[in-house]
């Protein structure tokens, strides 16, 4: 009998020990779950009236921007209620609250609206409110945005904030409350109408209580063409090369590099990157500058400028010319970077002859080049060039689905020297997104589409928007000329000035550029330093382009006529990116 009693005692003690351990583990692992259940069970003190804002996903369904639940202490004021009593009750729950701030919270907004007394409660504070069972105080759930990949592309995704004073009238007229949060930048602003959802509708009763008429409807989800894994890979490449560059001479002004990768047949952007070097350990994401910051792009735009020669029958491609320099009256001579021998149009692209482009510009002005000649030009010649450049997407708004896109600077002065500069990409400035639009249009043989980030929008799983990638314009140029540009660009990347910039296995085509740029290094409003900026734009494979790539590195070196060392960061970045693409192709073939 004693053995039985002893066994029973041991069994009971063991049972309660195991049960205690189980409850401890359950509480630890499922604390938030049971907290939510507790709130649900005590629903009389819970109010959820705002719709969930739509989320943002990448092309593979990876969550990029989501919603994080926030618990708040709230109160709903009754008619003729003494606010002093409400403040005292609030201080009983949280003595650390400032009474003046509680009064301010109670007096915000309309009388029938819930008043937020304390924001962002911890789980412990929520339990404290629920266990104290305060009269008429309740837990109000709200949500704030969270970014799955930190600051990566955050300026592209945009921000959500309260309505600003200057936009107050617009939003109030469109059904918003003054206290609502709205998208104020990036995709959040561009697609506000889809992301915001529909608020719950209530009837305000005579006693200031609310009766639900219709529940809230969550916002729609954006699905981007972006591949976040590729974005992260490209960021790593840019950072690595900026660190390497800063160890080399003449790179004190090199801090930024931009990359955009897309599908030229649709304009879908699969990676958009911008990194600014602060030191070897710290960088800042400046991806949005791809659509707002402009630079002289240099020879990379010669696919568009040589099109002027084709369209206006200024090129006899059965005839070769001897590369040299152009010397106009009273002006310094202008040359290619070296003497390049005899050239036709394809060889001129391959070796990036400035002289060949100068001859086209002079012919456009109705003259044949003679050394020391006087050349008269008008707005007409500049307009012809700029209209051709614009037909490719340079010097105009591209229409990318982001707010506040800016175009580069369009020069206002008209002179023979500047016309020659315009012909080689050394006058007007363009943004990286304009450069992408140009190379995509070229790769599509004249079909211009707007670059885009969102390919689909879903609401509760149903597709409510599908990007159809409309052709916005066709460049007025025949197929035979595109074939010649393609041949020239193919030669650039395989035999010419761009040799080694892109992995040969991808069968690439493209163009490089080096341009003069200028800096105000002491911020006194005056240009004091000349630099060189480096660019490249290409696509692959040449026979049926699937991908396009642009790389822009402003102020990469001193403007020293290439007599000193230049770290060609665009070469290294574009090569590593295309090596990565080649490795993906090899892996897919192995599978």
Each language-model region and where it sits:
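Charged, low-complexity surface patches
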Residues: 50, 118, 298-299, 378
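Periplasmic/cell-envelope proteins involved in peptidoglycan metabolism and beta-lactam response
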Residues: 1-282, 389, 521-523, 559-591
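Beta-lactam-recognizing serine transpeptidase/beta-lactamase-like catalytic domain environment
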Residues: 63-65, 201-213, 226, 251-298, ...
């Amino acid at each position: 009998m004693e053995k039985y009693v002893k066994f029973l005692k041991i069994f009971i003690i063991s049972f309660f020990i195991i049960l205690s351990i189980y409850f401890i583990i359950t509480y630890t692992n499922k604390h938030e779950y049971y907290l939510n259940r507790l709130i649900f069970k005590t629903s009389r003190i819970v109010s959820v009236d705002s719709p969930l804002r739509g989320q943002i996903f990448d092309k593979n369904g990876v969550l990029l921007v989501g919603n994080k639940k926030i618990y708040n202490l709230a109160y709903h004021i009754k008619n003729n209620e003494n606010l002093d009593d409400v403040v005292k009750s609030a201080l009983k729950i949280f003595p650390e609250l400032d009474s003046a701030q509680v009064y301010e919270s109670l007096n915000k907004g309309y009388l029938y609206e819930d008043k937020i007394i304390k924001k962002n409660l911890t789980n412990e504070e929520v339990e404290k409110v629920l266990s104290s069972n305060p009269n008429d105080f309740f837990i109000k759930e709200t949500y704030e945005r969270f970014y799955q990949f930190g600051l990566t592309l955050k300026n592209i995704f945009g921000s959500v904030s309260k309505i600003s004073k200057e936009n107050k009238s617009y939003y109030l007229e469109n059904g918003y409350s003054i206290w609502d949060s709205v998208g104020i930048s990036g995709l959040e602003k561009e697609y506000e109408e889809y992301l915001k959802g529909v608020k719950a509708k209530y009837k305000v009763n005579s006693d200031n209580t609310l009766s639900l008429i219709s529940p809230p409807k969550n916002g729609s989800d954006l699905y981007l063409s972006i591949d976040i894994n590729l974005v992260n890979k490209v960021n790593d490449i840019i950072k690595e090369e900026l660190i390497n560059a800063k160890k080399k001479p003449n790179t004190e002004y090199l801090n930024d590099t931009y990359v955009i990768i897309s599908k030229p047949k649709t304009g879908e952007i699969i990676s958009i990157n911008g990194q600014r070097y602060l030191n070897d350990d710290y960088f800042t994401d400046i991806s949005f500058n791809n659509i707002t910051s402009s630079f002289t792009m240099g020879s990379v735009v010669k696919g568009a400028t040589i099109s002027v020669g084709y369209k206006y029958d200024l090129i006899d491609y059965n005839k070769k010319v001897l590369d040299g320099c152009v010397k106009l009256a009273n002006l310094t001579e202008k040359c290619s970077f070296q003497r390049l021998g005899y050239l036709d149009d394809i060889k001129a692209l391959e070796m990036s002859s400035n002289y060949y482009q100068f001859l086209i510009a002079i012919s456009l002005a109705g003259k044949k080049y003679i050394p020391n000649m006087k050349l008269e030009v008008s707005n007409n010649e500049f307009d012809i060039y700029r209209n051709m450049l614009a037909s490719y997407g340079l010097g105009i708004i591209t229409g990318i689905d982001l707010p506040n896109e800016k175009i580069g600077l369009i020069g206002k002065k008209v002179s023979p020297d500047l016309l020659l500069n315009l012909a080689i990409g050394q006058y007007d400035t363009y943004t990286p997104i304009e450069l992408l639009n140009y190379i995509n249009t070229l790769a599509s043989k004249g079909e211009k589409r707007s670059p885009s980030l969102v390919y689909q929008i879903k609401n509760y799983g149903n597709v409510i928007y599908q990007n159809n990638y409309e052709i916005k314009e066709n460049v007025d140029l025949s197929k035979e000329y595109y074939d010649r540009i393609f041949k020239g660009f193919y030669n650039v990347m395989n035999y010419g000035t761009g040799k080694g910039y892109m992995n040969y296995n991808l069968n690439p085509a493209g163009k490089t550029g080096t341009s003069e740029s200028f800096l105000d290094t002491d911020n006194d409003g005056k240009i004091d330093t000349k630099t060189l900026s480096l660019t490249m734009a290409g696509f692959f494979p040449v026979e049926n382009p699937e991908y396009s790539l642009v790389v822009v590195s402003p102020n990469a070196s001193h403007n020293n006529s290439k007599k000193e060392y230049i770290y060609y960061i665009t070469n290294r970045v574009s090569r590593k990116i295309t090596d990565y693409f080649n490795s993906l192709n090899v892996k897919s073939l192995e599978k």
